[in-house]
């Protein structure tokens, strides 16, 4: 019985692998060619547009086309109590779009001039959080009476920028001597001092742990802690 050399088996395996790679490259090229086929060569199965569905157009003597005005559902309706059309400010939340609270950055004069917005953000308890109205707009295609832009709601002046209490507490406990917790919260100046003193020889590290637990150390941008759901 003839013996098959190991080198012969390896050589056959290499040829088989090379042939497989070439086959895959050919299949990939065919697939990419089909995917980049121009739209004019493809068979379209879309529904033909009926003549009655095409918008009416006016043609001038010079050949230019002037489109006619179409019906618009965003026009303002006059409020009539017996009619089913409600005021825009009474629409449910799924039919309106509300902007984020306006940030005045501590400018009280701008708040008094505009009449709404947030002078400051943040707060750990309800009584410490400012509330404001926000500018809302009725969505396109929704019929309602009165102005389509209006002030609504009593939104809290809070924002979230990706800071988690548990994560920051772990940073403070394990890496607090290097100021990692304050770096994460945006307190760069004090973080550098904490790093150079190795957490104030342990005293600063312990104080920051207490401040985090009691709510005395918060993000520098006045944002609130993100919650896990």
From Swiss-Prot:
Its main location: membrane. The chain crosses the membrane at residues 160-180, 195-215. Keywords: Glycoprotein, Membrane, Signal, Transmembrane, Transmembrane helix. It is a multi-pass membrane protein. It holds the Pfam family TM2. GO terms for cellular component: membrane. Residues 1-32 form the signal peptide. Residues 181-194 are cytoplasmic. The keyword Signal applies. Glycans are attached at residues 34, 58, 72, 107, 130. InterPro entries: TM2, TM2D1-3-like. The keyword Transmembrane helix applies. Residues 33-159, 216-229 are extracellular. It is found in: Membrane. Residues 162-210 form the TM2 domain. PANTHER family: BETA-AMYLOID BINDING PROTEIN-RELATED, TM2 DOMAIN-CONTAINING PROTEIN 2. Belongs to the TM2 family. This is TM2 domain-containing protein 2. It comes from Danio rerio (Zebrafish).
């Amino acid at each position: 019985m003839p013996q098959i050399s190991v080198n012969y088996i390896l050589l056959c395996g290499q040829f088989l692998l090379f042939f497989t790679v070439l086959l895959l490259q050919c299949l990939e090229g065919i697939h990419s060619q089909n995917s980049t086929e121009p739209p004019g060569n493809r068979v379209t199965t879309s529904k033909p547009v009926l003549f009655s569905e095409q918008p009416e157009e006016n043609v001038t003597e010079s050949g230019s086309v002037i489109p006619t005005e179409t019906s618009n559902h965003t026009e303002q309706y006059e409020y009539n109590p017996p009619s089913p059309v409600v005021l825009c400010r009474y629409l449910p939340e799924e039919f309106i779009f509300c902007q984020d609270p306006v940030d005045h950055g501590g400018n009280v004069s701008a708040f008094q001039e505009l009449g709404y917005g947030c002078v400051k953000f943040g707060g750990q308890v309800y009584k410490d959080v400012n509330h404001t109205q926000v500018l809302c707009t009725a969505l396109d295609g929704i019929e309602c009476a009165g102005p389509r832009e209006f002030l609504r709601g009593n939104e809290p002046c809070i924002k979230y920028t990706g800071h988690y209490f548990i994560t920051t507490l772990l940073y403070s406990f394990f890496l607090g001597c290097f100021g990692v917790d304050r770096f994460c919260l945006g307190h760069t100046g004090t973080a550098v001092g904490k790093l150079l003193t190795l957490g104030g020889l342990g005293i600063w590290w312990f104080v920051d742990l207490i401040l985090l637990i009691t709510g005395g150390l918060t993000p520098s941008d006045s944002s609130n802690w993100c919650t896990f759901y």
